[in-house]
């Protein structure tokens, strides 16, 4: 087995074993973390978070065997995050989700020990400083990931466009065209956030991420959530294993400070 297929979320290839192939898994700025809201430091110097997302920059939707991912055209600065803790704009490369088998777990970050059923990650890279996503992903200030918690409740009308496309990528390594999806529709009303220096939450676990975790969750219906759970970790020819519990548990903070853009 080669490349990204030598890790997963099972008993033998799951997060507790990743350090064998990726020693950085035990590094000093690993993600996700449990955000202890009372210990987050309000930082008035933090800028407001600005998300400039153009409507028609999405390209495709893919089941990569670990999650479902939407890729974006990142050839220019039309779809970026800026402000917040960031110096300059970071371009949106892709978004993906993590979710659980049941509604009491699924998110990667937790808040005061509480898990959410799912977490959306919007992955951006520093194109002002680095020439490729790969180069940025290896640099300490290369990536900015915006995390959004999902909870179940009312249906999220804008999410239907995405959940209705999931049947096309049910199996691992399947891909479909997915154009003109604006991820702005998946953001909560409030832009309050926590931020801290961290890592990718999947191998190679590079410590290259400025994390921006939005405080306010978005809501989707249980029916919409079930469509994520109907995806498969496996290819069409393999025994079917449902794609659930594809999250890494919280990692030690190791002295890092979590900053808050708001006063608790």
From Swiss-Prot:
Its main location: cytoplasm. One of its GO terms (biological process) is positive regulation of synaptic transmission, GABAergic. Pfam families: Carb_anhydrase. Zn(2+) binds at residues 96, 98, 121. It catalyses: hydrogencarbonate + H(+) = CO2 + H2O. PANTHER family: CARBONIC ANHYDRASE, CARBONIC ANHYDRASE 7. This is Carbonic anhydrase 7. It comes from Mus musculus (Mouse). The gene is Ca7.
